[in-house]
């Protein structure tokens, strides 16, 4: 694994981003392989039910796929960007659950 500098993704991150930005599904597989544990770590305390976590993680994957073009290295690391997406989406999911609304 490459050591990452502050605000500068390592080679693996660049490769993952490049694949995602070209629409290569293998990029998402690589991203989830490398950062899936981080995403689960962020989501778990917010969504204690496994079913809710799995639903949310699917939504997170879709959001990453749709918005990968908005990631810029000068604003932070890939891990920080993914953490922000996961946290915000988990909070939104929890709010919907609390209100009794389910996303269809």
Residues of each region from the PLM?
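Short, charged helix-capping/linker segments at alpha-helix termini
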Residues: 2-7, 21-30, 40-59, 70
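Hydrophobic/aromatic residues within well-ordered alpha-helical segments
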Residues: 31-35, 39, 86
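Charged catalytic carboxylate motif
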Residues: 12, 38, 81
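Structural recognition of an alpha-helix C-terminal capping motif at a helix-to-coil junction
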Residues: 41, 55-62, 76-88
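Arg/Lys-rich amphipathic alpha helix in sigma70-family domain 2
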Residues: 69-70, 84-104
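Short acidic-aromatic loop segments in the C-terminal HATPase_c
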Residues: 65
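Acidic, Ser/Thr- and Pro/Gly-rich low-complexity regulatory segments
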Residues: 10-16
């Amino acid at each position: 694994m490459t050591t990452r500098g502050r605000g500068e993704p390592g080679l693996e991150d660049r490769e993952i981003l490049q694949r995602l930005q070209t629409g290569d599904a293998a990029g998402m597989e690589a991203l989830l392989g490398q950062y899936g544990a981080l995403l689960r770590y962020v989501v778990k305390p917010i969504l204690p039910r496994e079913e809710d976590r799995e639903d949310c993680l699917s939504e997170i994957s879709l959001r990453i796929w749709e918005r990968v073009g908005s990631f810029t290295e000068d604003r932070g690391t890939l891990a920080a960007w993914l953490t922000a997406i996961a946290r915000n989406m988990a909070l939104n999911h929890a709010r919907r659950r609390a209100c009794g609304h389910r996303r269809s």
